[in-house]
Design a protein with these regions (language model features):
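Catalytic P-loop NTPase motifs of RecA-like helicase/translocase cores
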Residues: 32, 58, 94
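Conserved GTP-binding G-domain of TRAFAC-class P-loop NTPases and closely related GTPase folds
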Residues: 66-146
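Core residues of folded domains in eukaryotic genome-function proteins
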Residues: 2-6, 19-24, 44-48, 80-84, ...
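Switch I (effector-binding) loop of TRAFAC-class P-loop GTPase G-domains
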Residues: 1-18, 131-134
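Inter-motif core of Ras-like GTPase G domains
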Residues: 34-57, 65-78, 84-87
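Switch II (G3) loop of P-loop NTPases
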Residues: 17-36
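Anionic-ligand binding region
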Residues: 61
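Conserved Walker B
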Residues: 29, 54-55, 90-91
Length: 146
């Protein structure tokens, strides 16, 4: 299991005159063994698409929330204000959970992580930034979905 890389030119870029800038996409699977690869590519990221399996969500909810929390609190993501899109895959399946359900469950799990990690002294937290950023981000997401 490894990440996939590709570069391509957007159709809108092809129509422009002058220098055409390709988009570089890196697909890093959510397996724990590949987390170091994510740390390697995040500082260069202009955006993150975090994919959640809507059909098999409950069995992977804690792991997904933990991975999302780690991604959202990385210094490189916070400092550069990297846009994060949470994408629910397999929503066309009959047994898939709704995006609203997934959003609420992820928020609950992330809040659990925040509370437990806030209890740890700041001296013990490594490579994490102010968790207030995460709170503002969640409020922003809530405001846009209402």
């Amino acid at each position: 299991m490894e990440e996939n890389n590709d570069k391509f030119v957007l159709n809108s870029e092809k129509e422009r005159k002058g220098k055409v800038k390709p988009v570089h996409i890196v697909d890093v699977p959510g397996h724990a063994r590949l987390k170091p690869k994510l740390d390697e590519v995040l500082p260069k990221a202009a955006g993150v698409v975090f994919v959640v399996d809507a059909q098999d969500f409950l069995s992977s909810m804690q792991a997904a929330a933990d991975y999302l929390y780690d991604t959202l609190t990385k210094a490189s993501v916070v400092k550069k204000k990297v846009h994060v899109l949470i994408f629910c895959n397999k929503t066309d399946k009959v047994t898939a959970h709704s995006k609203e359900f997934i959003k609420k469950q992820l928020e609950k799990e992330i809040n659990k992580f925040r509370e437990s990690r806030n209890a740890i002294s700041s001296a013990e937290i490594s490579d994490e930034v102010n968790l207030g950023y995460l709170e503002r981000l969640l409020k922003s997401v809530n405001a846009r979905t209402r």
